[in-house]
Curated annotation (Swiss-Prot):
Recorded superkingdom: Viruses
Keywords of the record: Late protein, Metal-binding, Transcription, Transcription regulation, Zinc, Zinc-finger
Protein name per the record: Transcription factor TFIIS homolog
Transmembrane segments: none
Family annotation (InterPro entries): TF_IIS-typ, TFIIS_cen_dom, Znf_TFIIS
Span of domain TFIIS central: 77-201
Record-stated family: Belongs to the TFS-II family.
Residues bound to Zn(2+): 206, 209, 234, 237
């Protein structure tokens, strides 16, 4: 009973300064769920009370004191990330026509990234979570550069229902973009297998000593549909240049 009264009082104090009932309830509930005793609950909620009363709750403060204020920054960040996914999905005409579905998918995609990150924990949670969300957001963006549009497997499968939004967060790049992953793997394999044997030719003039005694080799440094790059070495002065 005492704990219930204390929680009501804390909610009242927080909301008085934040003027945001939803955010107030989120902060208080997160602190309550993380605490297993009334003492720990008060330890978790104390920083919020102090900073609210002094009007010092800011993003900068949260980052400097991320351990104690982590519930606050995570809740705020998740809302921002969900909006980011919503705006990205709405760029596609399908989601422009289905706003409710767009909202649902944005929330589920963010949640899948959140749960995936929570299980990893190799880096700090916020850093890993932010990185993961940025990667997924790029993958589902329909406004990619022209040469990337054909590789948007994930967005097409999301629209068709083949891919569930709640599963995206834990999937690998190869699972989300099989076409792009296969293309990348093929290019890497081709480059590793290409012949780099040097040949001698008088076709290339050394810009250093002006002689035409050079060895050269062709290397596929760009996309497969673009010409190879020719690396030349002057046999006279040893200068290296691109032919």
């Amino acid at each position: 009973m005492k704990m219930h009264i204390a929680r009501d009082s804390i909610v009242f104090l927080l909301n008085k300064h934040l003027q945001n009932t939803i955010l107030t309830n989120k902060i208080e509930q997160e602190c309550f769920l993380q605490a297993d005793t009334p003492k720990k609950y008060l330890q978790y909620i104390k920083p919020f009370l102090i900073n609210c009363m002094t009007k010092n709750i800011t993003t900068d403060l949260v980052m400097k004191d991320s351990k104690r204020l982590e519930p606050y920054i995570i809740l705020e960040m998740r809302d921002i990330i969900q909006m980011m996914f919503f705006r990205t999905l709405q760029k596609h005409i399908f989601f422009k026509k289905h706003t409710d579905l767009c909202t649902e998918y944005a929330q589920k995609i963010e949640a899948s990234c959140y749960h995936y990150t929570y299980q990893q924990q190799e880096k700090t949670f916020l850093e890993e979570y932010s990185t993961r969300c940025g990667t997924i957001n790029h993958i589902i963006n329909c406004e990619k550069k022209s040469h990337q549009q054909q590789d948007n497997d994930a967005l097409n499968k999301l629209i068709s229902g083949e891919l569930k939004p709640e599963a995206i967060g834990s999937m690998t790049f190869a699972e989300l973009c099989p076409s792009a992953a296969l293309k990348e793997k093929t290019e890497i394999t081709l480059r590793s297998q290409q012949k780099v044997a040097e040949k001698t030719s008088q076709l290339y003039k050394c810009p250093n000593c002006k002689q035409r005694m050079c060895t050269y080799r062709e290397v596929q440094t760009r996309a497969l549909d673009e010409p190879s790059t020719i690396f030349c070495t002057c046999k006279k002065c040893g200068h290296e240049f691109i032919g």
